Amino acid sequence: MLQTPMTGMVQKLDQKLPVANEYLLLSGGVREGVVDLDLDELNVYARGTDYDMDFTLLVPALKLHDRNQPVTLDMRHSALCHSWLSLRLFDEGTISKWKGCCTIADHINGATNYFFSPTKVADWFYDSISIVLSEIQKKPQRGMPKVEKVEKNGTIISIILGVGSSRMLYDIVPVVSFKGWPAVAQSWLMENHFWDGKITEEEVISGFYLVPACSYKGKKDNEWRLSFARSEVQLKKCISGSLMQAYQACKAIIIKLLSRPKAISPYHLRSMMLWACDRLPASYLAQEDYAAHFLLGLIDDLQHCLVNKMCPNYFIPQCNMLEHLSEETVMLHARKLSSVRSDPAEHLRTAIEHVKAANRLTLKLQRRGSTTSIPSPQSDGGDPNQPDDRLAKKLQQLVTENPGKSISVFINPDDVTRPHFRIDDKFF
């Protein structure tokens, strides 16, 4: 958790933010899929050209505490995994502070009902941050980062700070923070999961968020999306290094290849990986030298989800995150993925070259000055899991030794003591 001087100054500006607040800092920007947000409205930033490191900071505008029972949200007006938020849950003081950031509707009993508006909250937050940053720049203090860029991307505020010779991108997201667990995801807890026995249920269900994003047909001014970013930080502790390496490699490929039109995001890939962890035997996923096989499996899973227009939210499986896609978009991306599947090593090498080029730009800038240490975020994998040449070589070996053949991961849950994968109709 991190409380930044900037958000502290925003709190002092008009006393809207909670005084005792917790901010979740995640390694990787919103474009990296660390939070389930829509990427359509985001400006394109390139690592190396625009920034060297990226983070996502979740800033609670409101907090609701656990009442020792599942949290029930008002989902009558929303698609699955989304909700409106009425300020009737809060005291009069909170309503008075925030009613300017609400839409208004008449309640059934004749009273005025204020619904917390994600777009209005984002507008207020951007204006407040702009005022605070302007004040900071007027009176610069020793050791304070240099503000290089501030932009509003939909409901997200993106700030690039210069710290020493490093440029850090922060995607700041205003959220509503809840302690406890939503009633709509209660049935998920009843299922068996890969993390059972590795971490406690209390660690997984310690809290969730509403983030400012609406469903495909939802009302932008009213609808929030459920986010389980806090839980995902805990679940990542249970994922093997080789699978995380495959995930990072696959993510690097799809960010470049499937960027237009927006259909598949890194968050979709993350959800597929979590489902794979539930589906496959732990002893298989623990294999240290199986990153290449895992990458092929993730590509296959991605292709399957696209063709079937089906990617269930990991925590709320009844919510299909791809149901809104058109057939045209599905087929376009499916063809692109087929090209990756036919020569995954080449596409991975291209992604690696992009990473290396970005790193060269970063090093070039860092030689001009010394770097300054930064706070450690809740890591999304970090550099050790970046795609590397060894994985590309392993993929190349699998493809070269079996020209023109379909290679897929196959799991026999009754026997995971040796490699299992399929080449055409033969299993090995």
From Swiss-Prot:
InterPro entries xref list: Mab-21-like_nuc_Trfase, Mab-21_HhH/H2TH-like, MAB21L/cGLR
Q: Which residues carry this modification: Phosphothreonine?
A: 372
Q: Which Gene3D superfamilies match?
A: 1.10.1410.40, 3.30.460.90
Phosphoserine modification sites are 373, 376, 379
**Which keywords belong to this entry?**
Nucleotidyltransferase, Phosphoprotein, Transferase
User: Superkingdom of the source?
Assistant: Eukaryota
Q: What class of enzyme is it?
A: transferase
Q: Where is the composition biased (Polar residues)?
A: 368-379
Enumerate the residue ranges of region (Disordered). 366-389
Instruction: State any single GO MF term.
Output: protein-containing complex binding
Q: What is its EC number?
A: 2.7.7.-
Q: Would the keyword Transcription turn up in this protein's UniProt record?
A: no
Say which family it is in. Answer: Belongs to the mab-21 family.
Q: Give the function comment from the record.
A: Probable nucleotidyltransferase that catalyzes the formation of cyclic dinucleotide second messenger in response to some unknown stimulus.
* Protein's recorded name: Nucleotidyltransferase MB21D2
Q: Which organism is it from?
A: Mus musculus
| Designated gene of the protein | Mb21d2
